[in-house]
Amino acid sequence: LGLSSPMTKDRKILEKNYQKASEEIIKKLDEGKNVAYLTLGDPTVYSTYIYIQRIVKKCGYDAEIINGVPSFCAVAAKLGDSLADRSEQLHIIPSSYDIEEALELPGNKILMKAASKLSDVKKVLKEQGQEAWMIENCGMEEEKIYHGVEEMPEKATYYTTLLVKEAIDKNS
């Protein structure tokens, strides 16, 4: 069963898509089949899965979440560094929203799915004097790692994650 999701913020389009996907899953469940929904990363972090799961459960079906490796944890592992040390704060932010305000938060920041606003993100990082690492397609064949804002391209793919740390070890 292949399900796709539109890349939009339009709530009406998204809700319609979640409903359609849920109906397809329920149809398979009613046929006595087990259904698994695979997602990149973890299904509880900025994932389409949770919206579909809520509808399926509301219709009286059981659904179990099996955790995955969140993309930002995979990014930290790939970079060979921690997300937060000792008392550092960690913020996980969808970068398609108010990025300037988010980057002013204390501590380290993970910017999820940053491609759509990459030029804005780079501009704000430069203005605020912050440094960052960026990974496109972490763990995938097309993976690319960028050390610093200056290395980052103007355009990136959907699965782009940035790690902004208060103190980046430039030797990493």
Regions found by a protein language model. Give the residues of each.
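Class I S-adenosyl-L-methionine
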Residues: 1-61, 150-152, 160, 165-170
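Short, surface-exposed amphipathic charged segments that create phosphate/polyanion-binding patches used
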Residues: 11-19, 78-81, 104-108, 146-152
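Short acidic active-site motifs
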Residues: 20-24, 97-101, 120
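Short, charged, surface-exposed secondary-structure boundary motifs
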Residues: 8-11, 74-76, 94, 120, ...
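A contiguous loop/helix-start segment that scaffolds small-molecule binding in enzyme catalytic cores
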Residues: 103-172
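General beta-strand structural signal in soluble alpha/beta enzymes
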Residues: 37-39, 65-68, 134-135
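Class I SAM-dependent methyltransferase SAM-binding "motif I" and its flanking Rossmann-like core
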Residues: 44-105, 153, 170
